[in-house]
Amino acid sequence: MTRILGIDPGSQRTGIGIIDIDEDGRSRHVHHAPLMLLGEGDFSQRLKRLLQGLGELIETYRPDEVAIERVFMGKSAASALKLGHARGAAICAVVMRDLPVHEYAATEVKLALVGKGGADKVQVQHMVGIMLNLKGKLQPDAADALAVAITHAHVRATAQRLGVNTQQAWSRKK
């Protein structure tokens, strides 16, 4: 059994999703939640809260591997920079605990789950719910975090079949 933590980084709210993968490659939902960062003081205090919150989550759920969404450049450079800082804090929380980090672009996650890189959030939420047999509507941040974890599980399985690392497996999937 392998436990994967998926992270959808954000400067106001970071999505967390945890799944277990059995020996046959089946995914099972373990936990999902947003890590709320607003109201934590200035931006540096939010980053501190993110670092501490992820550390506590890692200690509680003990993931084996971590998958995180890459930053994409939107309309606002300032927002992208803040998102990059949040992503950096998240990665620090992970590597400080000697866990491997695997990175995926949002388009790669959408392609892996929905079959097209331009899928919208509703389609991703729907597929995550189906794949993990979840009832009810998922929050976008949690759905994205679970989607990143599922994507990594698929890439990981492909890598094992091919006898290559996950980066090489993803390159072959495209």
Swiss-Prot record:
Cofactor requirement: Mg(2+)
GO molecular function, one term: crossover junction DNA endonuclease activity
Active site: D8, E69, D141
InterPro entries: RNaseH-like_sf (IPR012337), RNaseH_sf (IPR036397), X-over_junc_endoDNase_Mg_BS (IPR020563), X-over_junc_endoDNase_RuvC (IPR002176)
Subunit and interaction comment: Homodimer which binds Holliday junction (HJ) DNA. The HJ becomes 2-fold symmetrical on binding to RuvC with unstacked arms; it has a different conformation from HJ DNA in complex with RuvA. In the full resolvosome a probable DNA-RuvA(4)-RuvB(12)-RuvC(2) complex forms which resolves the HJ.
NCBIfam families: ruvC
Protein name: Crossover junction endodeoxyribonuclease RuvC
